[in-house]
Amino acid sequence: MAEITNIRPSFDVSPVAAGLIGASVLVVCVSVTVFVWTCCHQQAEKKHKTPPYKFIHMLKGISIYPETLSNKKKIIKVRRDKDGSHRESGRGNLLVNAESGLLSHDRDPRGPSPASCIDQLPIKRDYGEELRSPMTSLTPGESKPTSPSSPEEDVMLGSLTFSVDYNFPKKALVVTIQEAHGLPVMDGQTQGSDPYIKMTILPDKRHRVKTRVLRKTLDPVFDETFTFYGIPYSQLQDLVLHFLVLSFDRFSRDDVIGEVMVPLAGVDPSTGKVQLTRDIIKRNIQKCISRGELQVSLSYQPVAQRMTVVVLKARHLPKMDITGLSGNPYVKVNVYYGRKRIAKKKTHVKKCTLNPIFNESFIYDIPTDLLPDISIEFLVIDFDRTTKNEVVGRLILGAHSVTTSGAEHWREVCESPRKPVAKWHSLSEY
């Protein structure tokens, strides 16, 4: 019988190598498929994508850029035809200036029109405030309207109960803030208040404490004890306890309800704890005849049409509250065209000084023909982290300057181009 032989083809490639080749081919196919799908998807998006200029057009009149991007502010006119209508089918070319955050219009190559009015200037929505003139201030017979959060003088502000004791072994003054009664309503929505108390020992002002906030009550019971070490008993007669009663506000600065001043000259805690109750009175803001002085420097570049304003320093600023604490001043610079504010900037806060040195400069692009209608207002403000900031005084240079020195300073700046002109000015009441 013949022998049967099975003949099988032989492969030079091993099974492992064949598997690797197949995997590589699969990866390449998947990659090509993903790439083709991505390209097609991007093409479809481009066809349905809204041009970016339409988005900016939707936001016209709204500042979409932060003010801190640059210190430059541009003041540019709107181009109009003789008949008063805008060019290009009755509309001006609105542009958004990304550097300064101001709306502007294309410049006319022939130069700005001599006839200008306030509504022709690009004004940010938050720059729509008008310049307050000292000539239009309230007369002594008139009274400012009071807000719901600020109590009037004839409104009872309640009373505060506390106790004073002295720990002789530890040489420590012990003050317990117990409770308050009959506080006024500071929140019109909830018809209540969120009171707390800040206490300072005068005149050294080194010891400052505050209680916790009690929610929605006009008769808070604090019952908190504070111990002040290192105060000799012999010095108690020279100290004054200052209690500042406030109402917490989650969304803005806290409201000041009133204050209590207690000289320890008539208090003798040597025999034990002395409990006292005092009426809360309206906070006494010192009214000073002198508001201090401010030194500023101005320089105008007619070729670049650029005004450089430098806030140099201030001196002899008044203390703004009865506690006599050193102020935390800063300067707010407002630029007005006519009565409309078109730019605003402010310096950094200088802590615990009444003679601050700022040395901060701001640059504004102002066409030469607009200078007669430009005013620059400097507001010196006392910063308070807890309560509302107090305006120490103000200075106006330019078209609405009410002082001889201010008008003279502005005239020198306009008549001496490219030359910085620095002067001291007395601050007036705001």
Swiss-Prot record:
Summary of the tissues where the protein is detected = Highly expressed in brain and at lower levels in other tissues.
Modified-residue entries (Phosphoserine), positions: S133
Q: Which domain of life is it from?
A: Eukaryota
Write out the ranges of the annotated region (Disordered): 132-154
A GO cellular component entry from the record: dendritic spine
Residues that span the membrane, as ranges: 16-36
Q: Which cofactors go with this protein?
A: Ca(2+)
> Which residues does the record give as Ca(2+) binding sites?
D249, S252, D255
Note the topology in the membrane: Single-pass membrane protein
Entries under Pfam families matching the protein? C2 (PF00168)
Tell me what PTMs the record reports for this protein: Ubiquitinated, at least by PRKN, and targeted to the proteasome complex for degradation. Ubiquitination is inhibited by ATP13A2.
- Which UniProt key words apply to this protein? Calcium, Cell projection, Cytoplasmic vesicle, Endosome, Golgi apparatus, Lysosome, Membrane, Metal-binding, Phosphoprotein, Repeat, Synapse, Transmembrane, Transmembrane helix, Ubl conjugation
Q: Which residues lie on this side of the membrane: Cytoplasmic?
A: 37-430
Q: What does this protein do?
A: Synaptotagmin family member involved in vesicular and membrane trafficking which does not bind Ca(2+). Inhibits clathrin-mediated and bulk endocytosis in neurons, functions to ensure precision in vesicle retrieval. Plays an important role in dopamine transmission by regulating endocytosis and the vesicle-recycling process. Essential component of a neuronal vesicular trafficking pathway that differs from the synaptic vesicle trafficking pathway but is crucial for development and synaptic plasticity.
What does the record say about domains?
The second C2 domain/C2B is required for the inhibitory role in both clathrin-mediated and bulk endocytosis. The transmembrane domain and the first C2 domain/C2A are critical for the inhibitory role in clathrin-mediated endocytosis or bulk endocytosis, respectively.
Family in the record: Belongs to the synaptotagmin family.
What is this protein's record name? Synaptotagmin-11
Q: Which organism was this protein described from?
A: Rattus norvegicus (Rat)
Q: Gene encoding this polypeptide?
A: Syt11
